[in-house]
Amino acid sequence: MKKQPKMTAIALILSGISGLAYGHGYVSAVENGVAEGRVTLCKFAANGTGEKNTHCGAIQYEPQSVEGPDGFPVTGPRDGKIASAESALAAALDEQTADRWVKRPIQAGPQTFEWTFTANHVTKDWKYYITKPNWNPNQPLSRDAFDLNPFCVVEGNMVQPPKRVSHECIVPEREGYQVILAVWDVGDTAASFYNVIDVKFDGNGPVLPDWNPAGQIIPSMDLSIGDTVYTRVFDNDGENPAYRTELKIDSETLTKANQWSYALATKINQTQKQQRAGQLNGDQFVPVYGTNPIYLKEGSGLKSVEIGYQIEAPQPEYSLTVSGLAKEYEIGEQPIQLDLTLEAQGEMSAELTVYNHHQKPLASWSQAMTDGELKSITLELSEAKAGHHMLVSRIKDRDGNLQDQQTLDFMLVEPQTPPTPGDYDFVFPNGLKEYVAGTKVLASDGAIYQCKPWPYSGYCQQWTSNATQYQPGTGSHWEMAWDKR
């Protein structure tokens, strides 16, 4: 039986209210970017090759959250913690060896770097640094490894950028494997976002015109004795079983993910003339105990390679439904309490933690749950200050392995006096065609919103009952049109 992907999910039910994201972003290559960041490749496959970073820990679910103290290089994350920005969530990113991370091709000269924001803080600037020519890729990243004069600085002018921005930079001359550090200095907090980008400069490594990247062996999970892992090779007509390579897991050693990845890559190189697997070393393909790219011979007629599994038993399914969290909680004389209901699928350990925006834990709960169990819990916050807060839910199996993680955002707000008619011009959407820059409306959430200045003011009139993305307070893109008063 072919191995099905492990089914993991955390369903977040918020009385019909979707989650919010606050001031987070990552280096991407969706439209114009030359290379994705290290953390980006923990969640998303590389553009063009499908490569991914593995064993990234919890940050693979939150690539937009590599946030730490600003002021680099004078202050900021300490040496050895630059890639993670000192965030415990991203600690795995601080591992540093020559073969630990997927490397994206790059050339010196004009290049485009791209950021994707899940929410867009006003911005002071973006800075880009690169490692020195003689840096040691097998030591933790430190200030000594980098040229501390940024090769590119883009001013943010203390305004909100769009949800995706591109920066044109001149990349210095380098050879081989280098690391670029991209720093987004937000303007309304004492924090910055740090993304390292693993790159390999073209023209300095082996030139292999006869081989094309076509897939990769990702050691994503351990297997069991009796399982089989195999390649699925495709040509123009679909899968061609004649080019399949199978590896039977017949020893305890081979059950480990890095071991079977190495063994499968080695077997491909030994048995297939049109395929090669491993990291490039000179003009050789060398299997490694980690992710092994797969290449196909030019002119072979083969197009791509995927990995399949045959297993003795299906993987367990895990899910956790969390309901009852409100979008906002008003601060009062009594401690804030979150009344939640949990429903488990599968035997698991469920963990919930509440953090404020500065990552300070305010409440936590953990307990083993059985399949189908329904449980009501109350989390009481240790302090209540107005602003952004997060409820982080984690699922672990009975062996303590993390199966999934999700973050849900909510706000604590100060008590407010209900607005009077004199405080606003219209009750939204009344008078829609009269909305101009500065127009104030009373929205469905009871708050007042003011139409942004030009060139954003035109969005204020873009609303129908079937197109609500700019509806103040509740639309998916309301912040592009309105300021909350």
Swiss-Prot record:
Keywords assigned by UniProt, alphabetized: Chitin-binding, Secreted, Signal
Annotated signal sequence range: 1-23
SUPFAM superfamilies hit by this protein: E set domains (SSF81296)
Residue ranges annotated for the Chitin-binding type-3 domain, each copy included: 437-478
Residues covered by the Chitin-binding type-4 domain: 24-201
Protein's UniProt keywords contain Disulfide bond: no
Single Gene Ontology MF annotation: chitin binding
Pfam families in the record: GbpA_2 (PF18416), GbpA_D3 (PF21868), LPMO_10 (PF03067)
Localization terms from the record: Secreted
Chief location bin: secreted
Source species, domain of life: Bacteria
UniProt-listed InterPro entries: Cellulose/chitin-bd_N (IPR004302), GbpA_2 (IPR041029), GbpA_D3 (IPR054063), GlcNAc-bd_A (IPR020879), GlcNAc_Chitin_IntDeg (IPR051024), Ig_E-set (IPR014756)
HAMAP family assigned: GbpA
Function: Probably interacts with GlcNAc residues. May promote attachment to both epithelial cell surfaces and chitin. This function enhances bacterial colonization in the gastrointestinal tract and may also be important in the environment by augment colonization of chitinous structures, leading to improved survival. Promotes bacterial attachment to, and colonization of, zooplankton in the aquatic ecosystem.
NCBIfam families membership: PRK13211.1
Name of this chain's protein: GlcNAc-binding protein A
Native species: Vibrio cholerae serotype O1 (strain ATCC 39315 / El Tor Inaba N16961)
